[in-house]
C-alpha cells in the first residue's frame, strides 16, 4: 500500500479551525476533537438563531402596533382586525414600517389609523 503524505494540509486545516476556537473555556480552545464539536454546535446555533431573530422581530413589531392602537386610538381593536382593515382599504404598509411610525412619530400613526378605522364603520 502506498503512503499518503498530507500532513501539512491536515495541520493547516486544524490550525484554521483552532484559530476560530480562541477564547473558549477549557479543552474546547486547545484540543482539536472537543473544539471541533463545539465549533459545529456553535455554527448550528448561529444558523438557527439567525432564523429565530426574524421571528422575534416580527412579534415585537406586532406588539408595538397593537399597543399603539390601544393607546392612541383608545379602542380595544386587535392587530389582526386592523390589518384586515388595511387590506380592505388597500393601504399597503409593512409591519416594520408601521411599528417604526408608532415608536418615532405617534401622531402620524394615529392620523394613518383613524381614516382606515372610520372607513370600515368603527366610530372613534
Swiss-Prot record:
Q: Where in the cell is it found?
A: Plastid, Chloroplast
Provide this UniProt record's keywords sorted from A to Z.
Answer: Chloroplast, Plastid, Ribonucleoprotein, Ribosomal protein, RNA-binding, rRNA-binding
User: What Pfam families does the annotation carry?
Assistant: Ribosomal_L20
Q: A Gene Ontology biological process annotation?
A: translation
Tell me a Gene Ontology molecular-function term this record carries: rRNA binding
Coiled-coil spans in chain: none
Primary subcellular site in the record, as a coarse category: plastid
- Free-text function comment from the UniProt entry: Binds directly to 23S ribosomal RNA and is necessary for the in vitro assembly process of the 50S ribosomal subunit. It is not involved in the protein synthesizing functions of that subunit.
Entry protein name: Large ribosomal subunit protein bL20c
Q: In which organism is this protein found?
A: Euglena gracilis
Q: What is the lineage of its organism?
A: Eukaryota, Discoba, Euglenozoa, Euglenida, Spirocuta
Gene this protein is translated from: rpl20
Amino acid at each position: 500500500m502506498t503512503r499518503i503524505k498530507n500532513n501539512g494540509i491536515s495541520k493547516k486545516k486544524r490550525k484554521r479551525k483552532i484559530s476560530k476556537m480562541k477564547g473558549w473555556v477549557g479543552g474546547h480552545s486547545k484540543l482539536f476533537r472537543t473544539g471541533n464539536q463545539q465549533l459545529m454546535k456553535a455554527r448550528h446555533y448561529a444558523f438557527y438563531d439567525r432564523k429565530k431573530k426574524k421571528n422575534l422581530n416580527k412579534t415585537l413589531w406586532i406588539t408595538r402596533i397593537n399597543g399603539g392602537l390601544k393607546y392612541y386610538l383608545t379602542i380595544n381593536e386587535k392587530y389582526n382586525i386592523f390589518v384586515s382593515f388595511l387590506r380592505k382599504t388597500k393601504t399597503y404598509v409593512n409591519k416594520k414600517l408601521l411599528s417604526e411610525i408608532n415608536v418615532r412619530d405617534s401622531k402620524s400613526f394615529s392620523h394613518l389609523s383613524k381614516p382606515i378605522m372610520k372607513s370600515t364603520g368603527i366610530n372613534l
